[in-house]
Each structure stands twice: as structure tokens, then as C-alpha cells.
From Swiss-Prot:
Disruption phenotype: Mutant mice are born at the expected Mendelian ratio and appear healthy and viable. No alteration in thymic T-cell populations, T-cell proliferation, or peripheral lymphocyte development. Inefficient type-2 antiparasitic immune response to the intestinal nematode Trichinella spiralis due to impaired IL4 and IL13 cytokine production by Th2 cells. Disulfide bonds: none annotated. Methylation at the N-terminus by PRMT1 modulates interaction with the NFAT complex and results in augmented cytokine production. The modification Phosphoserine is found at residues 49, 51, 79, 81, 83, 118, 191, 197, 307, 362, 383. This is NFATC2-interacting protein. There is a cross-link at residue 120 (Glycyl lysine isopeptide (Lys-Gly) (interchain with G-Cter in SUMO2)). CDD domains: Ubl_SLD1_NFATC2ip, Ubl_SLD2_NFATC2ip. InterPro entries: NFATC2-Int_DNA_Repair, Rad60/SUMO-like_dom, Ubiquitin-like_dom, Ubiquitin-like_domsf. The gene is Nfatc2ip. It is found in: Nucleus; Cytoplasm.
Length: 412
């Protein structure tokens, strides 16, 4: 838009020129100046437009009366094209043309690219391009490569790359390597493993639950097979779930065999018996072993007499227990020795206890020899004591006042 043309002439200003004019009033008038002349005055026309054309300046001749020549003032410049126009010089002097400074507006697409980083930083910095097809060629982590491989790129994007682009060369090299791998290993799947997602996690969770249910079902089938009562029909049982147990027959606790130890005189007999078997079988075996009548066999456990009808399970006998077997006198001898004394002889050990019958007129030497023979201690030096008194063997039971049930101690 062009500004209106306006003639400009000399106008009075303050400063040194004005003071000189005021000071000349009191002086003598000067000679009259020459009549008015035609002096061309320069008028600036600023054509403002959006184009990049330069400013047009038009100079038109205007008749201006010649004024008095003031002292030359310092020219002023105004960068803005306001209503006052350009700076004025002294009257009569040729005006200088001042061009307005304008900023050149450029298209954003034509803006020059200025490097942000220095040369060293730029050489070591690889910016990631925005194109998805070029992202595959950038060095990345294995997970990123798997994502890019799964997503893929369309052939139109590969064709859009320039023929001389380094990205296109790298893409071609990568495709050639993949083709070589496929030719060398045609049966091998070289596709990357998919990343675990939320769906895969939920799928794994459901698979784990299914496996647990299958295990519980098989355990229930195993319990039903081991139980005595099977409610399932054989048609419903699967051949894969059958369990065969190869074991011997389960015997009850009462029919279990164990070795019973029987001590008779100087012998120790080991006899296998059952827990539910009565001790009468033991009595018969010992009578046959000693060649005497079963009525003369007496079994003792500690100081208590065992009944032939008792069983090892009722007596709670174990493998470490030992039973003493005593041979009693015959019935004919019993009538003769009805007045005999039954004396107990106890050795140093607890199991070395023996009950011996002795007549009141017999010396104690008979008791000592019978004990040594029964315990297998013949030839050993033994000492017999009664109430703390050492016995020589020549004493009679009546002399010592012995009665049935008295205890005689033996020390070796």
C-alpha cells in the first residue's frame, strides 16, 4: 500500500540555526536574496507489498520557495517508514536516497540446515530415522529386532528409498544373509520368538491349572485302585491310569515270626516262633531236646513262671528277651523229696539265677556242684554266701536254718 504524496519544505527547528536567526533580529538587515527558484525536492514513496521486490523511490519536482540557508545540521536517519518520512538535510543540498530495510520472509521448507553438534559428536551419533523401514537397519536390542521383524514393512516403503542410499544397501545385505540362512538350514525355523504378552501369561496360567487338575485326577484314581472297594466299573477305567503293585502278601502282626532265645543250663537255644503261637510248643520242643517229659519243663521269665497257654504277643516278648528253662524232678522223686527245701541260687548276673531242691540232711556241696553244672561253670572258682557268710560246702541246711525260698549268692 502506497503512502500519500506530501510536499515537504524547510521548516524552522530549534537548535543553533534558530538561535542565530533570533540573534540577527537586532542587527542590520541584510541584502535581499534572489527571487524564488525551482528546486527539485525529493519525495519518498514506499510501496509495501508481500513480495520480495525492492522499494520503489519516486522523485517529483516541486516548487519550493528558497529560504535562508541555516547552518548545516547533523543528518538523522529513521529506519521506520512513518509519516515523517526520511531525514532532512540543509536546504538547497541534494537529498540522499535512503532505502528501507526489509526482512526477507522464507518458506519453511527452504530453511537451511544448521548442524547442532560439532563434527566429533556428529560422527559418533547415529540419529534414528522416522521411517519404519529404516528402523530395521539401526543397531538395536534383540527385543526391538523381534518387534521390527514381526511388524515387517511393505514393499512400497522399500522402493521409496533412493537407489544410492546406505540404508538400502544395508537392507539388501540383510535380506541376502537371511536367504543364505534359509538355504543352509531349510528345516530350521529362524523366526524370532514372540515376546511374552498378557495373553501368553494368562494362557500359561490356564495350562498350569489344567496340569494340576490332571495330577489330582490321577491321584484320585490311584487311591481308588488301592482302596478295597472299587466303585468304578472296569469299562470306565483307562488302561493308561492302571497301577500294578508288585508286593508280597501283607501278613498280620500276630502271624509274624521272630527268634525266641531259651537258656537251659549252659546252653542257649534259638527257636523261631510266631507271635500268636502258645508257649506249649516251646515246652514240647525243650522236652524233646532234653529227653524228658513235658510235665517236667518249667519256663521262667525273670522271677515269674510262664504259663504254657500264654503267647509272645500277650507277654510282649521281643528279640532281645531270654527265657529260662528249668527241668523239674519226676513224680516218683517228688514223693520222696516232699520234705526237700527249694533254695534259690543267684549269680553275679541277673540271668544267672537257678532254683534247686535240696534235702535237709544233704550238705550244701551238692547244691554248689549242681549249680556249676547247670550254668556251665565247672572248673571256675566260685564263692557261695548266705546272709554275708561264706559257705564251705560241708554245712547242712538245718545247721544254717535254711528254709524254702531262701537265697544263696554266688560270686566268681
Amino acid at each position: 500500500m502506497a503512502e500519500p504524496l506530501r510536499g515537504r519544505g524547510p521548516r524552522s527547528r530549534g537548535g543553533r540555526g534558530a538561535r542565530r536567526a533570533r540573534g540577527a533580529r537586532g542587527r542590520c538587515p541584510r541584502a535581499r536574496q534572489s527571487p524564488a527558484r525551482l528546486i527539485p525536492d525529493t519525495v519518498l514513496v514506499d510501496l509495501v507489498s508481500d513480495s520480495d521486490e525492492e522499494v520503489l523511490e519516486v522523485a517529483d519536482p516541486v516548487e519550493v520557495p528558497v529560504a535562508r540557508l541555516p547552518a548545516p545540521a547533523k543528518p538523522e536517519q529513521d529506519s521506520d517508514s512513518d509519516s515523517e518520512g526520511a531525514a532532512e538535510g540543509p536546504a538547497g543540498a541534494p537529498r540522499t536516497l535512503v532505502r528501507r530495510r526489509r526482512r526477507r520472509l522464507l518458506d519453511p521448507g527452504e530453511a537451511p540446515v544448521v548442524p547442532v553438534y560439532s563434527g566429533k559428536v556428529q560422527s559418533s551419533l547415529n540419529l534414528i530415522p522416522d521411517n519404519s523401514s529404516l528402523l530395521k537397519l539401526c543397531p538395536s536390542e534383540p527385543e526391538d529386532e523381534a518387534d521390527l521383524t514381526n511388524s515387517g514393512s511393505s514393499p512400497s516403503e522399500d522402493d521409496a528409498l533412493p537407489s544410492g542410499s546406505p540404508w538400502r544397501k544395508k537392507l539388501r545385505k540383510k535380506c541376502e544373509k537371511e536367504e543364505k540362512k534359509m538355504e543352509e538350514f531349510p528345516d530350521q525355523d529362524i523366526s524370532p520368538l514372540p515376546q511374552p504378552s498378557s495373553r501368553n501369561k494368562s494362557r500359561k496360567h490356564t495350562e498350569a491349572l489344567q496340569k494340576l487338575r490332571e495330577v489330582n485326577k490321577r491321584l484320585q484314581d490311584l487311591r481308588s485302585c488301592l482302596s478295597p472297594k472299587q466303585h468304578q466299573s472296569p469299562a470306565l477305567q483307562s488302561t493308561d491310569d492302571e497301577v500294578v503293585l508288585v508286593e508280597g502278601p501283607v501278613l498280620p502282626q500276630s502271624s509274624r515270626l521272630f527268634t525266641l532265645k531259651i537258656r537251659c543250663r549252659a546252653d542257649l537255644v534259638r527257636l523261631p516262633v510266631r507271635m500268636s503261637e502258645p508257649l506249649q510248643n516251646v515246652v514240647d520242643h525243650m522236652a524233646n531236646h532234653l529227653g524228658v517229659s513235658p510235665n517236667r519243663i518249667l519256663l521262667l521269665f525273670g522271677e515269674s513262671e510262664l504259663s504254657p497257654t500264654a503267647t509272645p504277643s500277650t507277654l510282649k516278648l521281643g528279640v532281645a528277651d531270654i527265657i529260662d528253662c528249668v527241668v523239674l524232678a519226676s513224680s516218683s522223686e517228688a514223693t520222696e523229696t516232699s520234705q526237700e527245701l527249694r533254695l534259690r541260687v543267684q549269680g553275679k548276673e541277673k540271668h544267672q539265677m537257678l532254683e534247686i531242691s535240696l534235702s535237709p540232711d544233704s550238705p550244701l556241696k551238692v547244691l554248689m556242684s549242681h549249680y556249676e553244672e547247670a550254668m556251665g561253670l565247672s572248673g571256675h572258682k566260685l564263692s557261695f554266701f548266705f546272709d554275708g557268710t561264706k559257705l564251705s560246702g560241708k554245712e547242712l541246711p538245718a545247721d544254717l536254718g535254711l528254709e524254702s525260698g531262701d537265697l544263696i549268692e554266688v560270686w566268681g
